[in-house]
């Protein structure tokens, strides 16, 4: 049995994502609900509870270290338009050059150079593989996707596969200790 999913052309999906995201941001009732929001490729809202204490701490520490080591632009819970809707990336790093072309309104339409996901107990390997693929594919595509395991261990990926250390930020530590 094979399954084929018909996705709309990239530009159409991008415009659809931006409209869906603007509607989501304009909803006063949703603004009162704590947590993180994403959309799927059909514009449906996907809600997740606020991150736990350790998760938030690791997000902050990763962002702090990226800013300290690389400078540039760091954001957390950053909306990124992908072929599967708007995803909230835990931590992103963008150069000034990438930011100037990637930002459209309140959403990135091109992936930042570095996208980081801090893993939670509910994340599945399949879900993380899917996000990694989406980030490498979004707009100009991420240069690297990082994962921070629940124990703080960092895993780094380039579009061609796992890498021992980040090529963009080789001084980044192999583990985030809180």
Feature roles, as predicted:
Residues 1-178:
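Gly/Pro/Ser/Thr-rich low-complexity, intrinsically disordered segments predominantly at protein N-termini
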